[in-house]
Amino acid sequence: MNFMTREVTGMAEIDGEQYAARKLGCEISADPLNPLDPIKKVCKSHHPDEDLSILDRAYRRAVIQHSAQRRKSGEPYIIHPLAVSQILADLGMGPIVVAAGLLHDTVEDTDYTLDQCRAEFGDTVAGLVDGVTKLSQLEVGDSAQAETIRKLVVAMSRDVRTLVVKLADRVHNARTWRYVKTTSAQKKARETLDVYAPLANRLGMNAIKTELEELSFKVLYPKIYNEIVVLVARRAGQRDVYLKQILAEINEDLDEQNIKAYVTGRPKDYFSIYQKMIVRGHDFANIYDLVGVRIIVDTIQDCYAALGAVHARWNPVPGRFKDYIAMPKLNMYQSLHTTVVGPGGKPVEIQIRTWDMHRRAEFGIAAHWKYKENGQAGRALSSPDKSDRKRDENNQELSEVDNLKWIQQLADWTSETPDSNEFLGSLKEDLGSSEVYVFTPKGKIVSLPAHATPVDFAYAVHTEVGHRTMGARVNGRLVPLDTTLDNGDTVEILTSKSDTAGPSRDWLSFVKSPKARNKIRQWFSKERRTEAIEEGRDELTRAMRKRNLPVNTLLTPEALVGVADDLNFPNADAVFAAIGDGQDSTCLLYT
């Protein structure tokens, strides 16, 4: 297989192997006097019609603002914004976002103001810089971390590129954790593993996700990490011989079928090996699938032809085939996944995809923008560069996928869940869960957490549908509401039209999605508050009559406003609710 170059969507002709294996943000300028050159080169390849002069201006400003600063590594501080902008350029971001990467620390760490940034570079760059700056202002304690993550979600719901810049910032900082105190590095690594890496995964940014996981794993579990490194190294020779045999046989089969492809093998990441050991309960000696094979072809038809060739040579492992081309993940990911019984009876995991799919798999939302208007707010989530719009128009494969819906759902959670720690817990739970894909009766795909139930489905469709759920059909059959849904199920919800319809507390024992759980709790909280207000009003009225006090005179709206103010309550209903809940005694109102 003599593959040398390949046209990649939105990119100039580049060497296929270099594209498939290149690490983000690691190209260093050959000219130390012009460190911006590789960034501009990559940015130009992605956005040939864009004016790149903003990059020169942003770099000059960053140099001025950071001239007296140094990193903890001892390097000039400008190294960091250059690295962040290089990562953003490699992701395919436009010059506006790359410029924001160059400037992202100026407002936070220097005397440069946001107003100055806005005047010099415009509202979009200033907005991105402001969004990233606000995410760095809370650093101490669990509650502060939870509030920071809440701010992150709000910022990315306004413009998802804020998160892309923050992820690039986190990647480069993670590469330099060895220069900071161990306790600080471990705190950042835990936050990264729990939140930032899963967020990158949800946005389809596998290259970012994988590196963040590896760097965090190394800091959090250094002993285990080093043990796995040594164990993998011991098998390296045997692994390479085995991998060479597999690649040769696949190439031979594809050549016979006249399928033009780029076939590559790679060792599994250390963190993924560790996860296999934990999930499967095996020690390293019993983990055989230490390598993965990837086949990249030109067309979807070639994907299935290559799959046929692979399965003709090796038997597939039952239950290990996934067709994410026919049913893409909601983060835009598309590929065929299969595990086969390879030479020597050892399992081999194989991914098959097109070049367009490969770019989306590595760079996710950064590679394929899908913009939508926020109907409630009447504003765009973000404004694409011209070449972003062109790329989106030319690629219709995933035109029906609304990949910003999940982000907007998170933004809704922030307003629905006042407690930041509770919100962070729900977010971690949602990010950490695997997914199941089911259908509405009209054929729309709904993504739910693994082991989700019809009640989770109902709340995913609409909150009111969830509240009014009284039954469910799965694949045409009536089922209990706690039934576990499987991939491909068609779910129909039966709802009540009664004015008194509402959820059951029992549902909290089996729902899996944070949204369903939060909505059910909110409903009962609201119901309980209404009951408490009525109970408090009745209790106060009875107490006043028992003491022969003039109810009609003392319980006027004007009088109650004064009472609430004297007792530091926001309004009269809050006073009644406190009495009804037993938080305050009616005697307080007589003094």
Model-derived segments and spans:
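Short hydrophobic/aromatic beta-strand micro-patches
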Residues: I296-D298
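Metal-dependent phosphohydrolase cores
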Residues: N2-R161
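Internal insertion modules embedded within essential enzymes
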Residues: G16, P32-L36, L114, G122-V125, ...
